[in-house]
Amino acid sequence: MTATVPPSTDTPAHDATETRHRKLAIIGSGPAGLTAAIYASRANLEPMVFAGNTPLGQLMITSDVENYPGFPGGIQGPELMQLFRDQAVRFGSTLVERDVTRVDLSQRPFRLWVGDDEYLADAVIVATGASALWLGLPSEEHFRGRGVSACATCDGFFFRDREIAVVGGGDTALEEALFLTRFASKITMLVRRDAFRGSKIMQDRAFAHPKIDVRWNTEVTEVRGEMTVNELALRDTASGEESTLAVQGLFIAIGYKPNTDLFAGQLDLDPRGYCLVESGTRTKIDGVFVAGDVHDHLYRQAVTAAGDGCKAAIDAERWLESVGEIEASTATNW
Protein backbone atom coordinates (compact mmCIF):
# COMPACT_ATOMS: atom_id res chain seq x y z
CA MET A 1 0.00 0.00 0.00
CA THR A 2 1.35 3.42 -0.95
CA ALA A 3 2.35 5.61 1.96
CA THR A 4 1.23 9.22 1.85
CA VAL A 5 4.11 11.39 2.97
CA PRO A 6 3.07 14.53 4.87
CA PRO A 7 4.52 17.86 3.85
CA SER A 8 7.19 19.09 6.24
CA THR A 9 6.07 21.70 8.75
CA ASP A 10 9.55 23.02 9.41
CA THR A 11 12.15 24.54 7.14
CA PRO A 12 15.77 23.40 7.52
CA ALA A 13 17.90 26.07 9.12
CA HIS A 14 20.42 26.55 6.33
CA ASP A 15 21.71 29.51 4.45
CA ALA A 16 19.99 29.97 1.09
CA THR A 17 23.26 29.34 -0.71
CA GLU A 18 23.50 25.91 0.90
CA THR A 19 19.89 24.76 0.54
CA ARG A 20 18.54 24.14 -2.95
CA HIS A 21 14.92 23.26 -3.71
CA ARG A 22 13.75 21.67 -6.96
CA LYS A 23 10.51 20.10 -8.10
CA LEU A 24 12.38 16.93 -9.03
CA ALA A 25 15.67 15.36 -8.03
CA ILE A 26 17.09 12.42 -9.98
CA ILE A 27 19.69 10.28 -8.23
CA GLY A 28 21.84 8.56 -10.84
CA SER A 29 23.07 9.45 -14.31
CA GLY A 30 23.05 6.27 -16.37
CA PRO A 31 20.58 5.67 -19.21
CA ALA A 32 17.64 5.61 -16.77
CA GLY A 33 18.56 8.77 -14.89
CA LEU A 34 19.45 10.84 -17.93
CA THR A 35 16.40 9.74 -19.92
CA ALA A 36 14.28 10.74 -16.93
CA ALA A 37 16.10 14.08 -16.95
CA ILE A 38 15.37 14.62 -20.66
CA TYR A 39 11.66 13.98 -20.22
CA ALA A 40 11.41 15.94 -16.97
CA SER A 41 13.24 18.90 -18.50
CA ARG A 42 10.84 18.94 -21.43
CA ALA A 43 8.04 19.15 -18.87
CA ASN A 44 9.70 22.31 -17.47
CA LEU A 45 10.53 20.63 -14.16
CA GLU A 46 14.20 21.75 -14.34
CA PRO A 47 15.40 18.59 -12.60
CA MET A 48 18.60 18.35 -10.63
CA VAL A 49 20.53 15.20 -11.50
CA PHE A 50 22.95 13.85 -8.93
CA ALA A 51 25.43 12.19 -11.24
CA GLY A 52 27.82 10.88 -8.60
CA ASN A 53 31.60 10.83 -8.46
CA THR A 54 31.71 8.32 -11.36
CA PRO A 55 28.97 9.76 -13.57
CA LEU A 56 27.11 8.41 -16.61
CA GLY A 57 26.70 4.80 -15.54
CA GLN A 58 28.09 1.39 -16.50
CA LEU A 59 28.27 2.21 -20.22
CA MET A 60 31.28 4.40 -19.44
CA ILE A 61 33.32 1.18 -19.20
CA THR A 62 31.73 -0.44 -22.26
CA SER A 63 33.76 -0.13 -25.44
CA ASP A 64 31.39 -0.83 -28.34
CA VAL A 65 27.60 -0.65 -28.01
CA GLU A 66 25.95 -2.29 -31.01
CA ASN A 67 22.48 -3.05 -29.68
CA TYR A 68 21.21 0.46 -28.94
CA PRO A 69 18.63 1.55 -31.54
CA GLY A 70 19.58 4.37 -33.86
CA PHE A 71 23.26 3.52 -34.23
CA PRO A 72 23.50 0.90 -37.00
CA GLY A 73 27.29 1.16 -37.03
CA GLY A 74 27.56 0.92 -33.26
CA ILE A 75 28.80 3.57 -30.84
CA GLN A 76 31.31 3.75 -28.03
CA GLY A 77 29.70 3.53 -24.58
CA PRO A 78 31.22 6.80 -23.29
CA GLU A 79 30.20 8.61 -26.49
CA LEU A 80 26.60 7.39 -26.15
CA MET A 81 26.41 8.54 -22.54
CA GLN A 82 27.87 11.93 -23.42
CA LEU A 83 25.06 12.33 -25.95
CA PHE A 84 22.53 11.46 -23.22
CA ARG A 85 24.13 14.06 -20.95
CA ASP A 86 24.24 16.78 -23.61
CA GLN A 87 20.57 16.26 -24.44
CA ALA A 88 19.54 16.43 -20.78
CA VAL A 89 21.52 19.63 -20.22
CA ARG A 90 20.20 21.16 -23.43
CA PHE A 91 16.63 20.94 -22.14
CA GLY A 92 17.44 22.44 -18.75
CA SER A 93 18.71 19.72 -16.42
CA THR A 94 21.33 20.61 -13.82
CA LEU A 95 24.00 17.98 -13.14
CA VAL A 96 25.76 17.71 -9.80
CA GLU A 97 28.75 15.44 -10.23
CA ARG A 98 28.92 14.35 -6.61
CA ASP A 99 27.40 11.45 -4.69
CA VAL A 100 24.29 11.78 -2.56
CA THR A 101 25.44 10.63 0.87
CA ARG A 102 22.15 10.64 2.80
CA VAL A 103 18.41 10.97 2.15
CA ASP A 104 15.34 11.57 4.28
CA LEU A 105 12.17 10.41 2.52
CA SER A 106 9.96 10.60 5.61
CA GLN A 107 8.33 13.91 4.71
CA ARG A 108 7.98 16.37 1.87
CA PRO A 109 9.89 18.12 0.58
CA PHE A 110 12.31 15.22 0.54
CA ARG A 111 15.79 15.99 1.83
CA LEU A 112 19.04 14.91 0.20
CA TRP A 113 22.57 15.57 1.35
CA VAL A 114 25.75 15.78 -0.66
CA GLY A 115 28.33 15.92 2.08
CA ASP A 116 27.25 18.90 4.20
CA ASP A 117 25.17 20.49 1.44
CA GLU A 118 21.43 19.90 1.68
CA TYR A 119 18.97 19.78 -1.21
CA LEU A 120 15.17 19.66 -1.19
CA ALA A 121 12.92 18.03 -3.77
CA ASP A 122 9.16 17.64 -4.11
CA ALA A 123 9.66 14.36 -5.99
CA VAL A 124 12.58 11.98 -6.37
CA ILE A 125 13.53 9.44 -9.03
CA VAL A 126 15.96 6.77 -7.85
CA ALA A 127 18.10 5.59 -10.76
CA THR A 128 21.26 4.49 -8.97
CA GLY A 129 21.62 1.28 -10.97
CA ALA A 130 23.31 -1.96 -10.01
CA SER A 131 26.99 -2.75 -10.03
CA ALA A 132 28.46 -5.98 -11.31
CA LEU A 133 30.36 -7.90 -8.68
CA TRP A 134 33.99 -8.24 -9.70
CA LEU A 135 36.82 -10.46 -8.54
CA GLY A 136 38.77 -7.53 -7.15
CA LEU A 137 42.03 -8.21 -9.00
CA PRO A 138 44.13 -5.22 -10.12
CA SER A 139 44.77 -6.99 -13.43
CA GLU A 140 41.03 -7.50 -13.91
CA GLU A 141 40.48 -3.75 -13.58
CA HIS A 142 43.30 -3.11 -16.06
CA PHE A 143 41.67 -5.22 -18.79
CA ARG A 144 38.05 -4.10 -18.37
CA GLY A 145 36.77 -3.28 -21.83
CA ARG A 146 39.80 -5.00 -23.37
CA GLY A 147 38.79 -8.61 -22.92
CA VAL A 148 37.23 -8.52 -19.45
CA SER A 149 33.47 -8.00 -19.27
CA ALA A 150 30.51 -8.57 -16.98
CA CYS A 151 27.84 -8.49 -19.69
CA ALA A 152 27.57 -11.28 -22.27
CA THR A 153 24.61 -9.61 -23.99
CA CYS A 154 26.61 -6.40 -24.40
CA ASP A 155 29.95 -7.84 -25.46
CA GLY A 156 29.50 -11.45 -26.57
CA PHE A 157 29.45 -10.55 -30.26
CA PHE A 158 33.06 -9.35 -30.08
CA PHE A 159 34.28 -12.84 -29.14
CA ARG A 160 33.12 -14.69 -32.21
CA ASP A 161 35.26 -17.80 -32.79
CA ARG A 162 37.36 -17.02 -29.69
CA GLU A 163 38.12 -19.15 -26.65
CA ILE A 164 36.85 -17.50 -23.49
CA ALA A 165 36.29 -18.18 -19.79
CA VAL A 166 33.28 -17.49 -17.58
CA VAL A 167 33.72 -17.15 -13.82
CA GLY A 168 30.80 -18.18 -11.61
CA GLY A 169 28.68 -21.13 -10.62
CA GLY A 170 25.14 -19.77 -10.29
CA ASP A 171 22.33 -19.19 -12.75
CA THR A 172 23.90 -15.91 -13.89
CA ALA A 173 27.09 -17.69 -14.96
CA LEU A 174 25.20 -20.55 -16.59
CA GLU A 175 22.99 -18.17 -18.53
CA GLU A 176 25.98 -16.11 -19.65
CA ALA A 177 27.92 -19.21 -20.74
CA LEU A 178 25.01 -20.61 -22.72
CA PHE A 179 24.41 -17.26 -24.39
CA LEU A 180 28.10 -17.00 -25.30
CA THR A 181 27.99 -20.35 -27.12
CA ARG A 182 26.39 -18.41 -29.98
CA PHE A 183 29.71 -16.68 -30.57
CA ALA A 184 32.70 -18.29 -28.88
CA SER A 185 34.41 -21.43 -30.16
CA LYS A 186 35.01 -22.74 -26.64
CA ILE A 187 33.90 -21.66 -23.16
CA THR A 188 35.60 -22.76 -19.98
CA MET A 189 33.53 -22.23 -16.85
CA LEU A 190 35.65 -21.59 -13.77
CA VAL A 191 33.81 -22.56 -10.58
CA ARG A 192 35.27 -22.01 -7.11
CA ARG A 193 33.39 -24.95 -5.64
CA ASP A 194 32.94 -28.57 -6.71
CA ALA A 195 29.37 -28.06 -7.94
CA PHE A 196 27.13 -25.49 -9.59
CA ARG A 197 24.70 -23.48 -7.48
CA GLY A 198 22.34 -22.81 -10.37
CA SER A 199 19.07 -24.50 -11.24
CA LYS A 200 19.18 -28.10 -12.46
CA ILE A 201 17.73 -27.29 -15.86
CA MET A 202 20.46 -24.71 -16.48
CA GLN A 203 23.13 -27.15 -15.30
CA ASP A 204 21.82 -29.85 -17.61
CA ARG A 205 21.94 -27.49 -20.57
CA ALA A 206 25.52 -26.49 -19.79
CA PHE A 207 26.70 -30.07 -19.30
CA ALA A 208 25.09 -31.08 -22.59
CA HIS A 209 26.59 -28.29 -24.67
CA PRO A 210 29.66 -29.34 -26.69
CA LYS A 211 31.26 -25.89 -26.47
CA ILE A 212 31.22 -25.72 -22.65
CA ASP A 213 33.92 -27.20 -20.43
CA VAL A 214 33.87 -26.92 -16.63
CA ARG A 215 36.80 -26.64 -14.24
CA TRP A 216 35.79 -27.16 -10.61
CA ASN A 217 37.56 -25.76 -7.53
CA THR A 218 39.21 -23.09 -9.64
CA GLU A 219 39.76 -19.39 -9.07
CA VAL A 220 41.43 -16.70 -11.17
CA THR A 221 44.46 -15.12 -9.52
CA GLU A 222 45.63 -12.90 -12.39
CA VAL A 223 44.51 -11.72 -15.82
CA ARG A 224 47.38 -11.46 -18.28
CA GLY A 225 47.93 -9.98 -21.71
CA GLU A 226 49.39 -7.06 -23.61
CA MET A 227 46.78 -4.89 -25.32
CA THR A 228 44.05 -7.46 -24.65
CA VAL A 229 43.58 -10.60 -22.55
CA ASN A 230 45.47 -13.71 -23.65
CA GLU A 231 45.95 -15.78 -20.49
CA LEU A 232 44.59 -16.42 -17.00
CA ALA A 233 46.57 -17.52 -13.98
CA LEU A 234 44.51 -20.06 -12.00
CA ARG A 235 44.66 -21.73 -8.61
CA ASP A 236 43.01 -24.95 -7.48
CA THR A 237 41.06 -24.06 -4.33
CA ALA A 238 41.37 -27.62 -3.00
CA SER A 239 45.02 -28.45 -3.68
CA GLY A 240 46.54 -25.00 -4.16
CA GLU A 241 48.05 -26.11 -7.47
CA GLU A 242 48.64 -23.27 -9.92
CA SER A 243 48.07 -23.38 -13.68
CA THR A 244 47.35 -21.16 -16.67
CA LEU A 245 44.60 -21.04 -19.28
CA ALA A 246 44.94 -19.43 -22.70
CA VAL A 247 41.81 -17.38 -23.50
CA GLN A 248 40.94 -14.24 -25.44
CA GLY A 249 38.19 -13.12 -23.12
CA LEU A 250 37.00 -13.33 -19.52
CA PHE A 251 33.39 -12.85 -18.41
CA ILE A 252 32.72 -12.29 -14.72
CA ALA A 253 29.28 -13.64 -13.80
CA ILE A 254 29.14 -13.74 -10.02
CA GLY A 255 26.11 -11.49 -9.72
CA TYR A 256 25.08 -7.86 -9.35
CA LYS A 257 24.57 -5.64 -6.34
CA PRO A 258 21.90 -2.94 -6.62
CA ASN A 259 23.11 0.44 -5.39
CA THR A 260 20.40 0.82 -2.75
CA ASP A 261 22.29 1.07 0.55
CA LEU A 262 21.33 4.74 0.64
CA PHE A 263 17.63 3.83 0.82
CA ALA A 264 17.70 0.91 3.27
CA GLY A 265 14.98 1.31 5.89
CA GLN A 266 13.10 3.87 3.80
CA LEU A 267 12.18 2.12 0.54
CA ASP A 268 11.00 -1.48 0.33
CA LEU A 269 13.78 -3.73 -0.96
CA ASP A 270 13.67 -7.39 -1.94
CA PRO A 271 16.04 -9.91 -0.28
CA ARG A 272 18.74 -9.07 -2.86
CA GLY A 273 18.44 -5.34 -2.25
CA TYR A 274 16.50 -4.35 -5.39
CA CYS A 275 13.85 -1.63 -5.04
CA LEU A 276 10.28 -2.88 -5.08
CA VAL A 277 7.62 -1.01 -7.04
CA GLU A 278 3.89 -0.94 -6.37
CA SER A 279 2.64 0.27 -9.75
CA GLY A 280 4.70 1.20 -12.78
CA THR A 281 7.67 3.06 -11.35
CA ARG A 282 5.99 4.11 -8.09
CA THR A 283 7.36 3.03 -4.73
CA LYS A 284 5.47 2.75 -1.45
CA ILE A 285 6.26 6.43 -0.80
CA ASP A 286 4.18 8.98 -2.68
CA GLY A 287 6.49 11.09 -4.81
CA VAL A 288 9.38 8.61 -4.97
CA PHE A 289 9.89 6.66 -8.19
CA VAL A 290 12.51 4.20 -9.41
CA ALA A 291 13.98 3.47 -12.83
CA GLY A 292 16.50 1.12 -14.37
CA ASP A 293 18.70 -1.59 -12.93
CA VAL A 294 18.07 -0.47 -9.36
CA HIS A 295 14.88 -2.53 -9.56
CA ASP A 296 15.30 -4.51 -12.81
CA HIS A 297 17.36 -7.64 -12.20
CA LEU A 298 16.01 -9.46 -15.25
CA TYR A 299 16.91 -7.43 -18.35
CA ARG A 300 19.70 -5.03 -17.30
CA GLN A 301 20.01 -3.37 -20.71
CA ALA A 302 20.63 0.27 -21.57
CA VAL A 303 17.51 0.44 -23.73
CA THR A 304 15.23 -0.99 -21.03
CA ALA A 305 16.75 1.34 -18.44
CA ALA A 306 16.11 4.30 -20.73
CA GLY A 307 12.49 3.20 -21.13
CA ASP A 308 12.16 3.03 -17.36
CA GLY A 309 13.57 6.54 -17.07
CA CYS A 310 10.96 7.83 -19.51
CA LYS A 311 8.15 6.18 -17.52
CA ALA A 312 9.46 7.46 -14.19
CA ALA A 313 9.64 11.05 -15.45
CA ILE A 314 6.07 10.89 -16.77
CA ASP A 315 4.86 9.30 -13.53
CA ALA A 316 6.64 11.97 -11.47
CA GLU A 317 5.28 14.82 -13.56
CA ARG A 318 1.71 13.52 -13.35
CA TRP A 319 2.06 12.99 -9.62
CA LEU A 320 3.38 16.53 -9.08
CA GLU A 321 0.38 17.82 -11.01
CA SER A 322 -2.02 15.68 -8.96
CA VAL A 323 -0.77 17.11 -5.65
CA GLY A 324 -0.76 20.69 -6.90
CA GLU A 325 3.02 21.16 -7.05
CA ILE A 326 2.75 22.14 -10.71
CA GLU A 327 -0.16 23.61 -12.62
CA ALA A 328 -2.07 21.41 -15.01
CA SER A 329 -1.17 23.78 -17.83
CA THR A 330 2.50 23.05 -17.18
CA ALA A 331 2.02 19.36 -17.95
CA THR A 332 3.46 18.07 -21.19
CA ASN A 333 1.46 15.88 -23.55
CA TRP A 334 4.72 14.16 -24.56
Regions found by a protein language model. Name each.
Residues L95-R160:
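Glycine/small-residue-rich loop that forms an oxyanion/phosphate-binding "nest" at active or ligand-binding sites
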Residues G28-G33, G129, G168-G170, G292:
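Conserved phosphate-binding and hydrolysis motifs of nucleotide-dependent enzymes
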Residues A16-F91, R162-E163, L174-K200, D270, ...:
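Beta1-alpha1 glycine-rich phosphate/pyrophosphate-binding loop at the start
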Residues T2-D10, A88-V114, E118-Y119, T181-S279, ...:
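A Rossmann-like FAD-binding core segment of flavoenzymes
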